[in-house]
Amino acid sequence: MTNGQEPIAMLIAVSSADRLDLWQAIVLGFVQGATEFLPISSTAHLKVVPVVLGWGDPGVAFTAVIQLGSIVAVLSYFRQDLTYVLRGLVSAVRRQDFRSEPAQMGLGILFGTIPILIGGLLIKRFIPDYDNSPLRSLAAIAIVSIVMGLLLGIAEQLSKHQRDLSQLRLADGLWMGFAQALALIPGVSRSGSTLTAGLFQGLKRDTAARFSFLLGIPAITIAGLVELKDLLEAGIDGSSLGVLAIGTLSSLIFSWLAIAWLLRFLRTHNTWSFVVYRIIFGGVILTAIATGTLQNI
C-alpha cells in the first residue's frame, strides 16, 4: 500500500491468524469441516467454540480462508457430478438447448450464486468492520440459530420429499441461491438455509443436500480466495501462514467426512435432529449470556 495504511479487513485477517497456535488451528479446522456441510452453521460454531474455550473470535478472514479446505473436499467428493454438469452445459451451449438435466443443474448453480456474491460485495463495501458488527454477536447468532431451526422444521413437515436431481430446474437453483445469500448473516448456515429452501421446493432430503453442496462451491471458493489475497497483501508471516495451512488441511479432512456422513444420513432419516440441536444450541447460548456465564461479544 503506497500510503502505509492497510485496509481494516487486512489488519483483522493478520491479527486473527497471529493469535492462534497450531493446536487451535486444528480444532477450528475440525469445527469448520464438521459443521460447514451440516445444517447447523459453521460460522456460528467458529464464533462460539473459540470464545467458550477462551481463545477469542478468530474473525471472518480466518474463517473464510480455512473454508478453502472444505472446497477441496467437496470438489473431490463430487468430481463426477461436476464433470457431468460441466459437460452438460458445454453440450447445451453448442446445441442452444438448456432443457437437459445437467444444463438445468449448471444454470441453477451459476444463477444461484449471484445473490450471495452481490450480498458479499455490499457487505465488503459498506460494512468494512464486519468482524465487530452486532450481527456477529453471540446473542444475534443464538437467535438466528433458533429461528432457522424452526424454519427447517416447518420445511421438513410441509415438504413432499419427492423430487430428485433429474427433476431439478433453474427455478430451484434461484430459490436456493436466494436462501444461500441469507447465510451472510452469522448463524443462518449456508447448508441449512439451502436445505430448507430445497425442502420447501419438495426435493428429497439427500437431493436438496447434494445440490446445496454443489451450489456452495463458487461462493465459498471466491470468498476464501479474496480473504487469502488480502492476507498475502497484508504481509502475513510464515508462522501465521502455517497456522492457516494446518487449519485448512484439518478443514479438508473433516469436511469430506461430514459430506459422506450427511448424505448417507439423509437417505434414511429426517432433519428433526438438526432442528432440535439448533434450538438447544441457541437456547444454551442465550441462557449463558443471561446468567453472565458467557459474554455477549
Swiss-Prot record:
What broad class of enzyme is this? hydrolase
Enzyme Commission code(s) on record: 3.6.1.27
Q: What reaction does this enzyme carry out catalytically?
A: di-trans,octa-cis-undecaprenyl diphosphate + H2O = di-trans,octa-cis-undecaprenyl phosphate + phosphate + H(+)
| Gene Ontology BP term (one) | regulation of cell shape
Q: Which domain of life is it from?
A: Bacteria
Q: How does it sit in the membrane?
A: Multi-pass membrane protein
Q: Which Pfam families match?
A: BacA
Which cellular component, as a GO term, is one annotated location? plasma membrane
Where is the protein situated, by its record's location annotation?
Cell inner membrane
Keyword annotations: Antibiotic resistance, Cell inner membrane, Cell membrane, Cell shape, Cell wall biogenesis/degradation, Hydrolase, Membrane, Peptidoglycan synthesis, Transmembrane, Transmembrane helix
Gene Ontology molecular function: undecaprenyl-diphosphatase activity
Membrane-spanning residues where?
58-78, 103-123, 138-158, 168-188, 208-228, 243-263, 274-294
Could you tell me what this protein does? Catalyzes the dephosphorylation of undecaprenyl diphosphate (UPP). Confers resistance to bacitracin.
Family that this chain belongs to: Belongs to the UppP family.
Give the free-text miscellaneous remark of the entry: Bacitracin is thought to be involved in the inhibition of peptidoglycan synthesis by sequestering undecaprenyl diphosphate, thereby reducing the pool of lipid carrier available.
What the entry lists under PANTHER family is as follows: UNDECAPRENYL-DIPHOSPHATASE
Matching HAMAP family: Undec_diphosphatase (MF_01006)
The name of this protein is Undecaprenyl-diphosphatase
Q: Which organism is it from?
A: Synechococcus sp. (strain ATCC 27144 / PCC 6301 / SAUG 1402/1)
